[in-house]
Amino acid sequence: MKTVVLVVLLAIVALGAIYIIFQQPAYPMNENDAKKFFLEDLREKYPNAGIREIMDITQLTSSDGSSYYQLKARVTNGEGTPCPERIHVYYDYPPKNYVSQPPEYITKSCKVCINEPHCILAFTEEAIIASHTYNGTGEIEKFIKDNSDAAATASAMDSYGNYTGVWLVKWSSPSSALSYTAVLSKTQNTVLEIIKESN
């Protein structure tokens, strides 16, 4: 009799444990948890990155009817340098098969528009690199070499003077009385103008 009662109690405890384990999802399913989990993962995978930010989050439904979030993040290394590296990282939450998509390199090794036949300067990092690597930017390239503390600020503009759809990238240095601004076309792989100013 005692054995039967003990077996019944163990069975009840086992069923209760199974119910608790399978009733609650392994990953909490809300947007804030997805963002938190993703940012923690980015901090671990890219500990030296200066910028790690979520650009987009979308809730989707998989073929089996379960809900998940698809996230896209920006990771930038060397944002204060002439050659910042920008990576886009994609992630599904909860993770599917624990196989993530490979990161997409937007800029790498001081190059823009990697594997793109027609270059569109869509991001700050691209504009900064283009401002001293495109044809016609020799003055800025020399300025950067002569001033190790040179830094750039980039602004996307709908219009500037007679130009439309441009980036303005201004290079300045505390150790120089000069600054340079490159006016770049967003879509034509072209330097439209180099402006030299005395500070």
Name each model feature, range by range:
Residues M29, P95-K96, P103-E104:
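Generic low-complexity segments that are intrinsically disordered, proline-rich and/or Lys/Arg-biased
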Residues Q23-L60, E116-M157:
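Short, non-transmembrane alpha-helical segments in secretory-pathway proteins
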Residues P47-K96, I144-S198:
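Exposed beta-strand-loop-beta-strand "reactive/processing" segments of non-cytosolic proteins
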Residues G16-Y19, Q24, S66, H88, ...:
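Generic intrinsically disordered, low-complexity segments enriched for polar/acidic and small residues
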Residues A17-I21, Q101-P117:
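Acidic/histidine-rich, surface-exposed loop or edge segments in extracytoplasmic proteins
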Residues V4-F22:
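Hydrophobic membrane-insertion alpha-helices, especially the h-region
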